[in-house]
Structures are given as C-alpha cells and as structure tokens.
Amino acid sequence: MGESGPVVIDPRRHDAVLFGVGDALGSALASQLGQIGVGTAAFAADGPAAAADRLRVRPGRCVVVAGDPAAVEAARTAGFALVIGLAPVGRDGDGLRGAGADAVVAELEQITVRTGDRRMSQLPDASQALTGGADGLAGRHPAVFFDFDGTLSDIVDDPDAARPVAGATAALTRLAARCPVAVLSGRDLADVTKRVGVLGIWYAGSHGFELTAPDGSHHQNDDAAAAIPVLAQAAGRLRDELGAIPGVVVEHKRFGVAVHYRNAARDRVGEVAAAVRAAGRHDALRVTTGREVIELRPDLDWDKGKTLHWVIEHLRRSGSGALTPVYLGDDITDEDAFDAVRGGPVQGVPILVRHNDDGDRATAALFALDSPARAAEFTERLADQLERGEG
C-alpha cells in the first residue's frame, strides 16, 4: 500500500486493529471498528504480537497503528497484515517508513473503514439465486466464473494434489454448452487448464494476468510480463530463506510467487509472512494473502475483478448480448471479483464457498454454498435450468 493511496481497514481482511498510540481506544475510529465487529486493543512494552495473542487473533489478519519506529518494526517482523505509522503534523514520518510502515498518516481520521458487508454465516444459500427476483437468475442469461482451489476443488495439504470434486467437470461441460463459463485461478494458466480439462471455456491464470479464450487465443498483461525475471529472483531468495522451515512450500509461478504455510508450525507463520513482505518491499512487488498462503505478484492495478470485466466486455463486443455475471469463489482474492460483480453495469450474483480458515469474516458476496461439492451441485442445477429454457 502506498502512502498516496487510501488507508483502508477492511473487515474481509482484518479481524482486529491494535493501537500503540495514546488514547486511540476512545477515538471515533475505534468506535466505528467496534460497530462492524472488528476487534481493538492497545499494546505497550510487550508489543503488538502479545496483544494479538490476548485477543486470540492472527497477526496475518490484524492491523497495527503505531507512532514509534520500534513498534512498527516489531509489527513488521511479526508478519502483521497492515502496519500504519502515525506521524502528527510537524513530525517526520521517514523513520516509520524506514521501519517498514505500509503507510504513514498524520491523524487517525485519515484511516477509513470499509462497511456494508455481511459475515459469511449471514448469507442465504445460493439455491435462492436460481429463482426470480432482483438478485435471482431466472429469466437472465448468465456468464459464470469460478475460482479453482476451494471452489471447484477441495483445499488439500499438498497443492499439487488438488483435483475437481466429483461431478464438477461434468457440470461445467453441461453449463458451457448453454452459457459462457470461465475459471479464474491464482495458479499458472497451464496448471489450472490441465487440472480442470474442460474444453470450450475461458481459463485465466495468475489472478488474470494471463488467459486463454474458448477458441484457444492467448492473452496476457504485457506490463506484468516485465516482472517475470524479478519474480524468479524473489522466488530463489525466498527458497533460500524459508526452505529450512518444515511445512513451508515456495511455489514459483510465471506471474507470481506463492508461499504456502498450511503445514508449518503456527509459531513460524509470522516469520514466513515477514520474509515475504520484506521481499515485496525489496523488489517493488505487491503482496496478497489467501487461505494459508501469502503471495508476491506484479504491482499493477489488476485482479480477478478486472479480469472478469475484461472477459464480459470481450463477450459483449463479440455479440453475446446482455450477460449477468455470476462468480463463485472462496478466498480473499475472490473478493475483488465479488466487488466487480456487484458494481458492474449489470447487477450480478456473487457466491461465496464457505470455509473456516478465516473465521466468520466479512464478505461482499450475497449468497453462499457450504463446500466445493455444493458448488458442483449448484452448477448442475443451473445447467438443468438453462437446458429447460428457464435462464
């Protein structure tokens, strides 16, 4: 996050905010956080990591606000998700930046809070989206987008062992005969294409930096391609730095470096996150997080949501007519697509595939399914509906 951009606390990504400054717990910011279910606490000499332990929250899903470079550095070393330096007017913030602050503000009022989302447990079942009504699909022509891991496939300890759940590929094949279908994954394009193996659909890899159309034509983000050698170097350094930690896997992809820590000891996760964030700062790469993974990618304003809009626009120019976007995903990176589906020219249907990895976090989705198996069943039912001419 650059200092020139907005500083946002997002309950989809952040479970708590830890303050190391003055009477911040009595501030309007702290009050607003409490209203949306984001925890708050103060820390002192024992540091932010101890405060996170007391709140029983993970540093990787917490924000630290501190005015002391030592506290900023401690938060950075512990792997906190967002570290905000507070430098009142007249005070130089360079020391906070040098200690690793993601952003520096002059007052708490410069920090904004995302509101309006619901918790995962509050979402109605996606079967309701198959009906009519403002949010339903009856009588509409959909374009359906899927994440892979955690949506079409169960999350497994070994990412290389992931496969579509029973019935998923058959349902995708039937659906693709009736409407545009796309799989948008953080995996490499070749990897996700091979794992799904359904012909006649769109595939996007690396969160949309590279994709193929149903006719086999290939598209890539050329600005992102400039970062390929930098990512390769970062992957090598992270393997050297983290390779001795049991359970950590450094996965080098064409447009990214994913560091998986699902099988690592919990007391090593902060160390892993800190190393990846340091690599991102060193090489000017963007850091994103997911379910037991932290990733480096090109620092460009591109994500699954923008990829979805690009595909919809491509289909429109090809004469598809009005399309209602539907997106099924489970992870934090899928929230960009949920935002895109809700904020596009046509109100779409964002569907979260629920899990327990991040607790009952907030989401921009409007509907939910309880597992990849339920996502496959939903896909089958939608294909049935379209085959009957009810779409």
UniProtKB/Swiss-Prot annotation:
Any one GO MF annotation of this record: metal ion binding
Q: Which domain of life is it from?
A: Bacteria
Active site per database record: 147
Known InterPro entries for this protein? HAD-like_sf, HAD-SF_hydro_IIB, HAD_sf, OTSB-like, Trehalose_PPase
Signal recorded as keyword: no
UniProt cofactor(s): Mg(2+)
Catalytic activities: alpha,alpha-trehalose 6-phosphate + H2O = alpha,alpha-trehalose + phosphate
Q: Where does substrate bind?
A: 147-149
User: Pfam families from the xrefs?
Assistant: Trehalose_PPase
Gene3D superfamilies xref list: HAD superfamily/HAD-like (3.40.50.1000), Trehalose-6-phosphate phosphatase related protein, domain 2 (3.30.70.1020)
SUPFAM superfamilies, from UniProt? HAD-like (SSF56784)
Q: Under which pathway is this protein filed?
A: Glycan biosynthesis; trehalose biosynthesis
Q: Where along this sequence does the record place binding of Mg(2+)? A: 147, 149, 330
Q: Which UniProt keywords apply?
A: Hydrolase, Magnesium, Metal-binding
Tell me one GO biological process term. Answer: trehalose biosynthetic process
EC code: 3.1.3.12
Which family, according to the similarity comment? Belongs to the trehalose phosphatase family.
**What is the stated purpose of this protein?**
Removes the phosphate from trehalose 6-phosphate to produce free trehalose.
Query: Can you name this protein?
Result: Trehalose-phosphate phosphatase
